[in-house]
Amino acid sequence: WEYSMRASYGKGVGYSRIDGKGVIYISTPGFFLVALDAETGSPLEGFGGQVPVEGFPETGVVDMLADLGHPYDPYEGIPLETGYITASSPPIVVNDTVIVGNSAEQGYLQARVENVPGDILAYDKHTGALKWKFNVIPRPGEYGHETWENDAWEWTGDVSSWAPLSADPEN
């Protein structure tokens, strides 16, 4: 079987087993998390929900933009004046959790400082339900918030986990 998202877009995959079956997890350029049966390539039954975009399967997909907490259009994504975000490395699976990093505007000479924060998202590997979100720029009441000036958490986001993630499954 073959699964194609976009030509020349190979960021890698995450892999796990559920009830003895292999599952492949992919983050797409449009910031969707897709779970596929590793043997058949079919969308994983019971994972995610209906994405409000024509042509998507009824199961096997999570719209991660919805979990970032910013207004967006399912067809167009986040308005470019608000920011830009995509997946730049594969998701990782740690125990029962699929963890997804992302990338904001790419390159060393970014055109602006305003952007959507590249928060790290974690999903249940069985259902696709959001388990937690790590705010890369601390919000009020979170550890380290006072070290960010000018309410940076509200308007800047050129902080993200663009490189491949790693984790210690025992801790």
Model-derived segments and their meaning:
Residues 106-108, 139-142:
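Flexible loop/turn segments at secondary-structure boundaries
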Residues 36-41, 115-130:
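Beta-propeller blade signature
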Residues 38-46, 162-164:
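Contiguous hydrophobic segments
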Residues 36-38, 110-111, 146:
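Short acidic, glycine/serine/threonine-rich loops at helix termini
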